[in-house]
Amino acid sequence: APDGLATWISYQTASGDQLTQSLIGILPVQSPSLLGDPKFCQSHGTRYAYHAGAMANGIASEQLVIALGQQGILASFGAAGLVPSRIETAIQKIQQALPNGTYAFNLIHSPSEPALEIGAVERYLQYGVRCVEASAFLDLTASIVRYRVAGLHQTNGGIEITNRVIAKVSRTEVARRFLEPAPEKYLKQCLEKVWITHEQANLETHVTMADDLTVEADSGGHTDNRPL
């Protein structure tokens, strides 16, 4: 036992019985801020290594994102299912309340309505949204590549990544794509549309598509029946 600590403790039960038991160990009080990886906090500017994920159609609302952000917890606004103009309103409200940027916005893959995905990315870039939670992607798209690569800059110390991506995945092959640089075909598409510069395209060959991964279980909503 540590110096000054007894190896046996005695206590009285509610019924009045006196019991003696051996002391196995002592667990000090742990602050929630000590849990998780401190690198997550450093990367996202949070107090806690927690992330409140996006719930679609604004269920993860501005009020929720703001309340958690004010307490040092990263939360994603539920932008899925909302038109770009509604997303723009949410960006303005959240940025006004959280000028230091402790927030994220959802970017959901919309294969049947690519204009929604493109419109969301355009708003995120226009307003300087620095973190998105990418969800429902079965493959990368030009839009998510555009968001990531448009935030790359060469500095004296290396490559600065201003647009962070948290990828929510349920398949290993999708996780692998986010843990690698963007494929050349998407970089070419972005260059042809003048979404990125040639310098940024070159920088992307040294940068993965995501900073963090969220492992998704199967759900009652849209699902690919393949939880990790």
What is each model feature region?
Residues 1-228:
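Active-site entrance/lid segments in N-terminal catalytic domains of soluble metabolic enzymes
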